[in-house]
Amino acid sequence: MFTEDRELIDRSFKFLLASRALRSVALILVNLSLSLYLKALGYGLIFIGIVYFFIVLFNVLITFTLGTIGDRIGYARTLLIAEFLPLIALFGLAISENVRVIIASAMLGGITGSPGGIRGAFSPGMTSYIASNWPDERERVEKLSKIYATASFAAIGGSFLLATHGYLSHYFGTINSFRILFGISFILTLGSLISLSFLKETKRPKKTTRLMKKESFSYSLRVMIPNIINGSGTGIAFPLLPLWFELMYRISASYVGAVFTVAYAFTAAGSYFSGAFLNAKNIRAITVSSLARILQGLMLIAIAFTPLLFLSVILYSIRSFIAGIGTPMRSAINVRGISGEDYGTASAVQGIFTRSSQLTSGLSGYLMSEALDLPLVTGGFLQVAGALAFYWLIRSWEKKHNF
């Protein structure tokens, strides 16, 4: 997988895009479906929230393990190893409706319930792979924007498949229809795994520390602190968001899929806009990405108090467009001050704190059982606070380093 031929590395990028597209369809489908599936099986909100707590907890361990070995064995190999986990998980979900198998599979596959359009883009080693092979920040943002736009556009396929659930239910029943969809996700993830086997990457610099350099850790702290705040909000607001739409507006799983289909189209447009326009102009990335996150939080709060479904869909779609703009820039900023030999470990450590903060997903079901709007309002306020902290910490680093 290692090569010094830049042309080969650049040409292999298309296989990463293909992988992210297939992975996005599969994981968006299962992330949107899991809470609805558990509810259809008869489990309550508090139980579902607790399930997500353990899913996130296990995902923390996986993120750290795969991230740290990536600095030593290469990020393309890390991506390949990481893809085996959801493949096994989706097989388990497809063949059994036993709750123990469902929980174990969801934990192994990292099915955290996040319904964001770029969910399929992320796996351990992805950001590190981009940072390692394209050191120029503008080029990184361009590559990340293409990945996020591709994943978001492909996510429409995942939400569309969920929208077919109502049709399938007429023939196979509610539960078996979910399992059929999980089987389709398994096949798509297998395609993603095959695509990743064609990736090429530049040879890794020799690792000189057991964990990471002091300057890399110092910069990572500036990323981790706001990510803890934001991750707490994400954990509270998003795992049960598809279920929130179902309960708030009394719509079926098929209609939930339609809602997110619209939102993912807007996320894809935002990611394309970020890479094609904002990255080409003299715009400060930290300002744009922080403002985008603030607006995301405020709009989440507004959605919580929206009584009409069509208004909620409009607000969530606009929020998704804004998320598409900010995410590629934030991803590039996260590795800006990291040494080349520490990309994987730094991303893993940052991911640990972000994922750990999302253990608040255990509160999501409890808050929703008390009042439907509580998870969204709480999560929205935390996103705003996290964005303000991110801007202050990164901007102070930029000033110190005349960036």
Residue ranges and their predicted role:
Residues 61-98:
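Conserved MFS/SLC helix-loop-helix module at the cytosolic interface between two early adjacent transmembrane helices
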Residues 2-60, 219-260:
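Helix-loop boundary and gating motifs at the non-cytosolic
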Residues 50-68, 261-274:
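Central cavity-lining transmembrane alpha-helices of secondary-active solute carriers
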Residues 77-92, 287-301, 380:
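Structural signature of the two symmetry-related core transmembrane helices
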Residues 111-135, 325-338:
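Intracellular juxtamembrane helix-capping segments at the cytosolic ends
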Residues 21, 89, 99-121, 311-325:
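Hydrophobic core of transmembrane alpha-helices in multi-pass small-molecule transporters
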Residues 62-74, 166, 270-283, 368-369:
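Helix-to-loop junctions at the C-terminal end of transmembrane segments
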Residues 144-163, 351-361:
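Glycine-rich segments within core transmembrane alpha-helices of 12-TM secondary carriers
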